[in-house]
Every structure is written in C-alpha cells, then in structure tokens.
Amino acid sequence: MRTILALTTIVVLLLEVPSGARQPSWKMSATVAESCSCTVSCPCNFGGEPSHMPCEGNRIISIDSGNYDGVDLAGVQLIVTFNMRNWSKIYVSDKVSDQQMKAVEAMLPLAFAGFHKGMLSFTKAPITMEVTESRVKFSGPESSVDMEVMKGFNGKAVKVMNLPSAVFQDYTQFRSIAHTHTSATHSWNHKGTNGFTSRWETGSK
C-alpha cells in the first residue's frame, strides 16, 4: 500500500511540473557606476570581504542596449541602494514605460539576484546622471553620489582589468567626494571611499 501511495505522489508531482517550460530570452549591455563605504580599492570587487561592515552603497545601471522577451531596454536606468547581504532598494527611472518596468522586474532574479533577494522596494523615481572624463554624479530620491576619477602613472585614469565578475569589466577606479543616503530607516554619509565605473555584458544562454 505504501509503495502505491509513493508512486501516486510521484506521478502527481510530475504532472504538476510543466515540461519544457519556456525560459525568457534576454540580454543587456550596460554602463555601471557605484560608490560604497569600502576603502579604495574595494576588496569585494576582487572576491574578498568588505573593508567596512556593513558595506553601504549606491549603484546606477545605465542600459545602453538590450531587451527582455522582445521589450527594448535601451536607455533604461536604475539605481540600487544597498546594505550588502542585508537589504536593497531599487529605483527605476520614471521615464520608462510600463512595459519596460515590468520587463526590468521580471529580469531582477536573473540579472540582479543578489539585490533582488533582500529587496525592500521596487519603484519608479526621478534619476539624474552626469558623466565627464574626470567626474561622475548620480542621484535618486534618497541617495546621491559624486565621485572623481583616480589618476595614476602619467596622469592617466587608474584601470583594473579582468576582475572576477562580469559586472566589473573595463573597470576605472574612482574615489567618492560625497556619497549620501537618507531615509526614514537608514542613513549614511561617506567620502574618500571606493568608487568605480565599468562595463557589463550579460544575458540568457
């Protein structure tokens, strides 16, 4: 009798699992800029542990080209405010369409799994970004970042190549001038801490 019940349970479970469920098709090419509370250069980006606990940061992802199941994502910007491994807030530019907003939300567990896991909110909001050869500024409703490029030999920007994560390719080293966050539950104010810009290419296999 137990054998029959076990076999029945297996059959029911197999019937409940869709066979050959279609996986979404997506890809993204983006410019990334971030400042966090770690020292320069942030050990997290090399696969290490934060130099400042908890690691507090703001990252802007500016999608240059990409799509999710046919929805064009070119021009979409989002800011992730985070306390690493604890929580995140994700703000998508209020210029996106409803269709793009839904596509970004669907893509969160695929492209932004770490941030998605502890996500406290996912909302549209005004986002600004200014980029020059030596300076990057960006802001959202609760956070702002102003950082300057770090120069090395012969006055050229410091570059780090072939970091472990795809997120950190063509990495240019920056240092924060001002990095702030203020909300009802969390706040910070950092300067002289790590910052960077990078290129990120990712997508479904």
Where are these regions (language model features)?
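Positively charged n-region of N-terminal signal peptides that target proteins for export
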Residues: M1-I4
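Beta-strand-enriched cores of mature, soluble protein domains
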Residues: Q23-K205
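Compositionally biased, low-complexity repeat tracts
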Residues: E16-V17, K191
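Sec/Tat signal peptide C-region and signal peptidase I cleavage site
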Residues: V17-Q23
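Bacterial N-terminal signal peptides
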Residues: A6-E16
